[in-house]
Structures are given as C-alpha cells and as structure tokens.
C-alpha cells in the first residue's frame, strides 16, 4: 500500500503545482498538456516490460527499483523545469517508466506470496494506496507550496520514495 501511496503522491503533485509552474515559466495549456501526457508515454511502455522483468527477476527487485527510479525523477522535476521545457518532458517520461512497472511487479508478488483465496483482499488493500495517496497529495501539496515553494512538493515526495526503497530493499525478501 505504501508504494502505491507514494506512486500517487508523486503522480498527482504536478497537477496541483501546475498553475504555479505554468505561470512561472509562461507555458500555455498545450505545453502543460504535453507535460502531463509525457508521464503516461513512459508509463504505458513499461506496463508490459514490468511484467516480464518481474517474472524474470522477481517482483521485489523490480518494484523496489521502479520506486527508486520514479522517486529520483520526481526529485529532478524542479531542476528539469528550470532548465527547459524539453528537459522536463524527458524527466516526466523517465518518471513514467519507473511508475509503469509498479502494478505488474505487485501482481507478480501476489502470485508468489499471497495464497489464491486471499489475493482479492490483498489487491484491495494495496489499491487503497491510490485514493489515500491522491487525497494526501491534494491536501499536502498546496500546504508545502505555500510554506516552501512548489519545488519542495517534488523534493519531499520524491525523498519519501527513496526512504521507502531503503527499507524495502533492506528488509523484504523475495
């Protein structure tokens, strides 16, 4: 649940920060739409790849490195935006690549760790991270933006993913 929670706070924070980012850099709505959709360009590509990698190397490693990857690119988002519009698009595609393997990796873990009769409940529990992360991001991103600036929504949420990876990688076995 926590990885999915982090997935959604990292995914949603840009939609909350978008108006401020758009105003700061003078982007039009088309450019903003490209920023939003670039994430999904990477995301859709790794849906299939994530399943293949999880079957081959195990869901634990694939999920962990996916979180590490997308968290790293979440942290890079402000620097990318300040550098150039094009660089931000690249970073968002790369972030999507990391997030795209999340659910295939989870399903690989379910198949290996969770008895068949308990999988529906496990999936429901894990998927509860979607609305919880969404609510958290919609509430906390504006607070962080007011207190520290829009960039810190990306730094703080990305750092949470790095901390999660450290504990996951160290404590969870395949």
Language model segments and positions:
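Extracytoplasmic
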Residues: 2-29
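Helix-loop-helix hairpin linking two adjacent transmembrane segments in secondary transporters
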Residues: 126-173
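C-terminal ends and interior cores of transmembrane alpha-helices
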Residues: 68-82
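Cytoplasmic helix-loop-helix junction between adjacent transmembrane helices
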Residues: 91-131
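Helix-loop junctions at membrane interfaces in 12-TM secondary transporters
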Residues: 79-91
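Membrane-interface helix termini in secondary transporters
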Residues: 20, 51-52, 56, 143
């Amino acid at each position: 649940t926590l990885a999915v929670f982090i997935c959604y706070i990292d995914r949603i924070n840009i939609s909350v920060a978008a108006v401020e980012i758009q105003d700061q850099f003078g982007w039009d709505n088309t450019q903003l739409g490209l920023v939003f959709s670039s994430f999904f360009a990477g995301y859709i590509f790794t849906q299939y790849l994530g399943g293949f990698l999880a079957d081959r190397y195990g869901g634990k490693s694939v999920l962990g490195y996916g979180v590490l990857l997308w968290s790293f690119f979440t942290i890079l988002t402000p620097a990318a935006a300040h550098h150039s519009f094009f660089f931000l698009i690249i970073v968002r595609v790369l972030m999507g690549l990391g997030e795209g393997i999340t659910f295939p990796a989870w399903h690989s873990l379910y198949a290996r760790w969770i008895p068949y009769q308990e999988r529906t409940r496990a999936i429901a529990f894990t998927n509860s991270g979607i609305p919880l992360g969404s609510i958290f991001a919609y509430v906390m991103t504006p607070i962080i933006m007011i207190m520290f600036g829009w960039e810190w929504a990306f730094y703080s949420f990305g750092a949470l993913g790095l901390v999660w990876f450290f504990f996951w990688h160290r404590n969870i076995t395949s």
